[in-house]
Amino acid sequence: MAEFTPMMQQYLQTKEEYKDCILFYRLGDFYEMFFEDAELVSKELELTLTGKNCGMEERAPMCGIPYHAVEGYLNKLVANGHKVAICEQVEDPKLAKGLVRREVIRIVTPGTNLDMQALDESKNNYIMCIVYLADRYGVSIADVSTGDYYVTEVDSERKLFDEITKFSPSEIICNESFYMSGVDIEDLRHRLKITIYALETWYFGDELAETTLLTHFKVKSLEALGLADYDCGMIAAGALLKYLYETQKNDLNNISVIHPYSTGKYMIIDSSTRRNLELVETLREKQKRGSLLWVLDKTKTAMGARLLRSYVEQPLIDKAEIEKRQDAICELNQHVITREELREYLNPIYDLERLITRVTYLTANPRDLIAFRSSIAMLPPIKSLLGDFQCELLGEIREDMDTLEELCALIDRAIMEEPPISVRDGGLIKDGYNEDVDKYRKAKTEGKTWLAELEAKEREKTGIKNLKIKYNKVFGYYLEVTNSYKDLVPDYFMRKQTLANAERYITPELKELEDMILGAEDKLVTLEYDLFCEVRSTIAAEVVRIQRTAKAVAGLDVFVSLALVADQNNYCRPKINENGIIDIKGGRHPVVEKMINNDMFIDNDTYLDNGNHRISIITGPNMAGKSTYMRQTALIVLAQLGSYVPAASAKIGIVDRIFTRVGASDDLASGQSTFMVEMNEVANILRNATSNSLLILDEIGRGTSTYDGLSIAWAVVEHISNPKLLGAKTLFATHYHELTELEGKLNNVNNYCVAVKEKGDDIVFLRKIVKGGADKSYGIQVAKLAGVPDSVIARAKEIVEELSANDITEVARNISVDTGSKKKKEKLDEVDLTQMSLFDTVRDDDIIEELRNVDVGNLTPIEALNKLYELQNKVKNRW
């Protein structure tokens, strides 16, 4: 690199170490990028691409960003999936001998961004590490901004995707084996918007992982961390920690606890079900408004909002834990005044979790400390109010909550009420906190007064009436005495300069004043910065206490929110059972009732059990409310996260997982048709559901022909109803009225329909679920409601009358039920299983016969094309 300038050589050496990053290289007041980085950044950020002399004949492509505006540009690059290495000047350019020393102080990636402006305060920003070894997946998840750190293991790709969907990380790092395992990496990148990298093999050595973990958490064995049974997970946790060390360039003190967890502790909700039930965002707009979380979230703090989201995404399956949460909600609603006082005290609390991370990273500014102080000032009254409650969970929250009064007092004494953002501009430390600060501050403001006082004192003391204190840049401050008073100059005056008509002197006292006055500004700024850093370090040393307190505040915020929602919306406390009974009286959909006038929502009952009410077949027209009814039952996730539920009363049998098959759409990205997507989801449900699961199946089989669809739907119901094969509790909505014939043939299947009132050709949807099967689909009436032209409606009525002669219900009545035996079924020879065409009454029999007689094997390609063209013209001309 001899041809490059010294500065460019330094840049290229640094870039060589961080090849996979965009290098932000600090030059004075700018971060500059060169060569490929400059071209990429100028394009993505729409910056002007210029050139810089680098020692070669051609100028190096270059673009720059002002250092004071870097966050906005940086966040945009990171949001686009880039890694950015920040290379700072690590010595004062004024003191540098030769080239200023520079070092990369941090690497910012999508999963490690700490900028509060870039992060959604109500959502964690997770980074996930996946290790694939011996058909198992080790999974470790961290939120660097809050210090959360989790680890688990799963044994299938589907379970892995459930974890990915649950945590929704913005970045995944993995070993090469996972990258090459056949997992759809592009799907992760593009559909789920996740940045994913495969790291070098050495990151995933088990010895390195173990050493990294034991050293960081200061323990002597994996047992102490709860990782003894997590061989694969331990490697993932160690590799992730190593990666964070390398990107964050600090000791990661905010990651103080690791949480191993078993996926069996929570209800399993796969990605399809999460989307269909709209737990945290709506299916189409991807917005919070309209989701279950939107209804429940009355939290006052960012920490509470994040914790509530995790509760919604991870419902419990342990009865005691669920009831423990219910007890907290119950008691909060028994003390409404105290509950509202708690909300008032929670309201001013800032994001303590992310604030303490900034403190431990030494990036917290003075205003962050003021926000921290105003937050922890709320803790003593909150803890005092919690003393009024008796339930176990609120007692645990009170126990975990530290009032942190000494930290509040420290900040109160030390930091100005309205300090600047910058730590280098002074104005940080309060008067009275430090003697030297007070002295320098006084020198800065009262220096002229001190000089005038000294001048008067020396004039009186010496009798030199024209003695003056003056200043120049060469000598600083000095005493000037004219020659006429030279004889009165005392011995302690030290001559500095002789002029034609006067002498210039200094004294020890004047020199001391000079040092204080001239250096006061710089010394004050430096001292204030040092004192601020001391205060910040004192707070950082208490990170474990602060994080535990933050979690307690978040938990309180969640339960106060759930209590308020239950109170305002007339929710009831569900009785949790382990015998499989789901008995909901007057159930309502929590979201729909909020989106419309509450008085307009029609409530409904639901009863399912492990005996004769295992499956409910629900029939009725579109728009009648079948899907809303089924989804509101599925939202028993509310009960298992510990919340009250929208119903008059509810008994909820714990379910281990919920599956939904709702709606239909092509998966164009993977080349799958609507029907293939549907069948993939059905296959997943039948293979992974258990007898303790809840299934919500809407219109199984509608993506194919009538007979095929009916046959599949029928067989699916038979499979689910058989306790030896599955036996899961199921709500099964269908347009195939023929499935109502299963009631009576299968002793655990029951028919329900949506009540409809007919007024001539018009219909009124009553939105009420009643016993029995629907005998009509009312499709034409729904089409009329939708505004389909009258001519089309009239023609549809004619066609449906003709088609009704081909009723397949009679066929369904004669189908034998699969009981699981090996006995051969009777053939239904009299049934034509050909797809029933909409226009069976006007078949083109001659064209079909001609097509049947074509000898395809002996046609040339051009003859085949001509024959196809001929047949097509016949069809066109006929219609």
Residue ranges: model-predicted function:
Residues 204-212, 219, 267-271, 283, ...:
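Amphipathic heptad-repeat alpha-helical coiled-coil/stalk segments that mediate oligomerization
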Residues 87, 110-119, 251, 389-393, ...:
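Active-site phosphate-binding and catalytic loops of NTP-dependent enzymes
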